[in-house]
Amino acid sequence: MRDRLDLLAHDKPIPMHPDKPTYLRPIFEPDCARLGVAALEAGRVPPLVVNWTGDETVSIEEYCTYMAELMGKEPIFKYTSEGTWASLVPDTTFMHEVLGRAEVHWRDGCRALVEQCYPELLKR
């Protein structure tokens, strides 16, 4: 997400997979920290493999448009299969059982990222 934010902030095209929209489940720093502690507590031998992800499904186009709006910008999407991937929406059932749920709403996480990385561009 940070790479796309940097492109937005500098008015550069964002490479996107041509199978649009591209959905994923972003996870943000507070959830990574909290779920990281839960992962350490769940550790065992042999290792337990748990994928981490956010709980909300959102398109890259939607969250980029939202972050661009926060900065008073328009996103520029460049659809290409080179260096991009299609939607990735993993099942969170096992993560919920072992680690718990992600709690940060994607809009709140995006806003926090803009505030942290580009506070001078944030429209108040």
Indicate residue ranges for each PLM-predicted region.
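Mid/C-terminal beta-alpha module of Rossmann-like enzyme folds, strongest
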Residues: 33-86, 92
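Residue-level signal for the nucleotide or nucleotide-sugar donor/cofactor binding architecture
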Residues: 24-30, 55-58, 87-90, 101-104
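Amphipathic terminal alpha-helices
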Residues: 106-124
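Short, contiguous clusters of charged residues that form electrostatic/catalytic patches at enzyme active sites
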Residues: 2, 30, 34, 108-111
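Structural element of the ATP-grasp superfamily
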Residues: 4, 95-96
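Generic structural signal for alpha-helix termini and adjacent loop/cap motifs
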Residues: 7-11, 39-43, 116, 120
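Short, flexible active-site recognition loops that position polar ligands and cofactors
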Residues: 9-12, 96-104
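NAD(P)-dependent short-chain dehydrogenase/reductase
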Residues: 1-24, 29
